[in-house]
A protein has these predicted regions:
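N-terminal pre-ligand scaffold of iron-sulfur
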Residues: 1-60, 74, 78, 87-104
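Short cysteine clusters
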Residues: 45, 65-68
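Short Gly/Pro-enriched loop/turn and capping motifs at secondary-structure junctions
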Residues: 71
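Short Gly/Pro-enriched turn/cap motifs at secondary-structure boundaries
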Residues: 83-84
Length: 104
């Protein structure tokens, strides 16, 4: 199946400065709202599989997994600080009215 944008949630459901987990076609995805810009990525730390929405602390575009201290850039998924060494998968996001669409 080719990737396509699907409506995932309403933007109003994700307050600025927060990270929320949603299920999109059976994939658990975390969505971060950084000052009105939305980023989507796998809701699983690549170190020990903690939920990034549940255990993540967002500071600007840096998400820290409080399970063990790994840091990720929510824009790219890149690891900024260990112990994680593998980036998180990111998903393209677009806005349609109040709907947030994620490409899966």
């Amino acid at each position: 199946m080719a990737a396509e944008f699907v409506t995932a949630t309403k933007m109003s459901e994700i307050p600025s400065g927060s990270v929320t987990a949603i299920d999109v076609r059976g994939i658990r995805i975390a969505v971060a709202n950084v000052g009105g810009t939305y980023y989507a990525f796998d809701d699983e730390c690549t170190h020990e599989q903690c939920s990034l929405a549940e255990y993540g602390e967002l500071a600007g575009t840096t998400l820290t997994c409080t399970c063990h201290g790994s840091e990720f850039d929510v824009r790219t998924g890149k690891v900024l600080a260990p112990p994680a060494t593998v980036p998180v998968k990111v998903y393209p996001v677009r806005v349609a009215g109040d709907a947030l669409e994620i490409e899966v």
